[in-house]
Curated annotation (Swiss-Prot):
DNA polymerase III is a complex, multichain enzyme responsible for most of the replicative synthesis in bacteria. This DNA polymerase also exhibits 3' to 5' exonuclease activity. The delta subunit seems to interact with the gamma subunit to transfer the beta subunit on the DNA. One of its GO terms (biological process) is DNA-templated DNA replication. Belongs to the DNA polymerase HolA subunit family. One of its GO terms (molecular function) is DNA binding. This is DNA polymerase III subunit delta. Keywords: DNA replication, DNA-directed DNA polymerase, Nucleotidyltransferase, Transferase. It holds the Pfam family DNA_pol3_delt_C. It comes from Buchnera aphidicola subsp. Acyrthosiphon pisum (strain APS). PANTHER family: DNA POLYMERASE III SUBUNIT DELTA. It is an enzyme of class 2 (transferase). The gene is holA.
Length: 331
């Protein structure tokens, strides 16, 4: 099994275009970007046709069988994208996947996209054949993987940026692949032949602020105090409605409290039960293990007080209380 990260895909394709790729991960932006890159390289190699088959239920596998049956010796080179949207893979689908490897053909380039099933695929021992093929990582990158990806994109766009400005970008936008990509495009357009400083990045962050409350909550759940303060400060400068922050955090904290009470049930089962988005589950798991019950209850009490202060229009005091919340939950 060869894992190819987003910053390595172009180089890999330039070396050799393979006829079978497996996409693991659920980052929508990376899924689309990596797919487009392979499709472009494939087109240049003569794969002029593209077929997309969505597998939403077991019966949809018949569409794949039909695709192979209806193609003859004279059909054009084709890229077949199989997009798994089904909730679970059963035994029959796993067997069909294993049989698929016997159908591989040099004139059919296959992209298998597993989306939310990716973790299951990684752990499943029944899919032994997968280890022989290229796996393209479409998981949202974090830490070093995120830094490497941003470095690659900056080099591709030929952006000149100071080290401090670069790390501010990484620190602030980590986990938000689509938005940072848009920011990089913006930097290239605004300052094409200029060294981008930390001051310019700070200006961009404030002027083009487009972050949801969940992004702020994720940073709290990660225990990143400084980043949480930074995001909160931008919410304050932008005169964001603090009640939205309160309600969003309140909802997530109450879910954490309920999860902690269900001691006999696995955290993974609970995440499924409460319909926590796949992209946010790692943050909930970290908070579940890190934040104790006393801190959670104290935070809920403060949130109630904040809501009262919002109704009384004690707005400046509200933001101080939100800072206090960050300290309680991050430490």
């Amino acid at each position: 099994m060869k894992n190819i990260y987003p910053n390595e895909l172009k180089k890999s394709l330039m070396q050799k275009l393979h006829y079978f790729y497996i996409f693991l991960g659920e980052d929508f932006f990376l899924l689309e970007k990596n797919q487009d890159m392979i499709l472009n390289f494939a087109y240049k190699k003569g794969f002029l046709e593209k077929i997309i088959i969505d597998v939403e239920k077991n019966q949809d596998w018949k569409k794949i069988i039909l695709f192979y049956k209806t193609n003859n010796l004279f059909f054009k080179k084709t890229t077949l994208v199989i997009n798994f949207l089904i909730k679970k893979l059963n035994v029959i689908l796993i067997q069909n996947l294993n049989k698929m490897f016997s159908l591989l053909h040099p004139d059919i380039l296959i992209i298998l996209k597993f989306n939310h099933l990716s973790r299951f695929i990684q752990k499943n021992k029944s899919l032994k054949e997968f280890k022989n093929y290229n796996i393209v990582s479409c998981f949202t990158p974090y830490n070093l993987n995120f830094i490497n990806w941003i470095k690659y994109e900056i080099q591709e766009k030929k952006i000149n940026i100071e080290e401090k400005a670069f790390f501010l970008l990484c620190k602030y936008y980590e986990g938000n692949t689509l938005f940072i990509y848009k920011i990089l495009d913006m930097l290239f357009i605004i300052w094409p032949d200029t060294c981008i400083t930390e001051k310019k990045i700070k200006k961009i962050i404030i002027e083009f602020f487009d972050v949801s409350p969940s992004y702020w909550i994720n940073s709290i759940f990660q225990g990143k105090t400084e980043k949480s303060f930074y995001i909160l400060n931008i919410f304050f400068k932008k005169k964001y409605n603090p009640l939205i922050l309160v309600r969003s955090l309140q909802k997530d904290l109450l879910q954490l409290i309920h999860m902690k009470r269900e001691k006999k049930i696995s955290i993974y089962v609970m995440l499924e039960k409460y319909n926590i988005f796949v992209t946010r589950r790692k943050f909930f798991i970290k908070a579940f293990n890190k934040i104790n019950n006393d801190s959670l209850l104290k935070a809920i009490q403060i949130l109630v007080k904040i809501e009262v202060n919002i109704k009384k229009k004690y707005n400046n005091y509200v933001w101080n209380q939100l800072q206090e919340l960050i300290l309680i939950l991050c430490n």
